[in-house]
C-alpha cells in the first residue's frame, strides 16, 4: 500500500499486534533494538527497496546500503528526506538521534554522523523494522 507523507497511517495497538510478529512489535512500536548480527538484513545483498514493515513506506534503496561492521543494516541516505523523521533519544544514558517512519511513526533505529560515506551519515536500522522488495 503506497501512501504519501500527508496520508499518515494510524492503527490501534491491537491492530499492530495482529499485523506484526512479537519481535517486530517490540522494535517498531515499543522502540526496541534487535541484537547485532541477528536480523535478516544486516548482511543482505539484494537489489531493491527497503520498506517499513508496518506501513510499506519506501525508506532506503539498496544502493545506499553499506557494511558498517556493526551487525545492523546501515545506509548512508534515505530514499527521500520526508520519508524518515528524527527525534532526540536520551535513553540508556546516551544522547542519540532516533529515526522513525514518517508515515506510521514506527521506530527504525538511529542515525549517526560517523561514516566514511558521501553524506557522513550512518542510518543504523533494525532488520525487524524493514521489509525488502526486490527490484525485479
UniProtKB/Swiss-Prot annotation:
GO terms for molecular function: peptide-methionine (R)-S-oxide reductase activity; zinc ion binding. Keywords: Metal-binding, Oxidoreductase, Zinc. The active site is at 124 (nucleophile). Residues 13-135 form the MsrB domain. InterPro entries: Met_Sox_Rdtase_MsrB, Met_Sox_Rdtase_MsrB_dom, Mss4-like_sf. PROSITE patterns: MSRB (PS51790). Binds 1 zinc ion per subunit. The zinc ion is important for the structural integrity of the protein. GO terms for biological process: protein repair; response to oxidative stress. It catalyses: L-methionyl-[protein] + [thioredoxin]-disulfide + H2O = L-methionyl-(R)-S-oxide-[protein] + [thioredoxin]-dithiol. Zn(2+) binds at residues 52, 55, 101, 104. Pfam families: SelR. Its cofactor is Zn(2+). GO terms for cellular component: cytoplasm. Its EC number is 1.8.4.12. HAMAP family: MsrB. NCBIfam families: peptide-methionine (R)-S-oxide reductase MsrB. Belongs to the MsrB Met sulfoxide reductase family. This is Peptide methionine sulfoxide reductase MsrB. It comes from Synechococcus sp. (strain RCC307).
Amino acid at each position: 500500500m503506497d501512501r504519501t507523507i500527508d496520508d499518515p497511517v494510524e492503527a490501534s495497538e491491537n491492530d499492530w499486534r495482529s499485523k506484526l510478529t512479537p519481535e517486530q512489535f517490540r522494535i517498531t512500536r515499543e522502540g526496541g533494538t534487535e541484537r547485532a548480527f541477528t536480523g535478516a538484513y544486516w548482511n543482505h545483498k539484494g537489489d531493491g527497496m527497503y520498506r517499513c514493515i508496518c506501513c510499506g513506506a519506501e525508506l532506503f534503496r539498496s544502493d545506499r546500503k553499506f557494511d558498517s561492521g556493526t551487525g545492523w543494516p546501515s545506509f548512508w541516505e534515505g530514499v527521500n528526506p520526508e520519508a524518515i523523521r528524527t527525534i532526540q533519544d536520551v535513553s540508556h544514558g546516551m544522547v542519540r538521534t532516533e529515526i522513525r517512519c514518517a508515515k506510521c511513526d514506527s521506530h527504525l533505529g538511529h542515525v549517526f554522523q560517523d561514516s566514511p560515506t558521501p553524506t557522513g551519515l550512518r542510518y543504523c536500522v533494525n532488520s525487524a523494522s524493514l521489509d525488502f522488495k526486490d527490484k525485479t
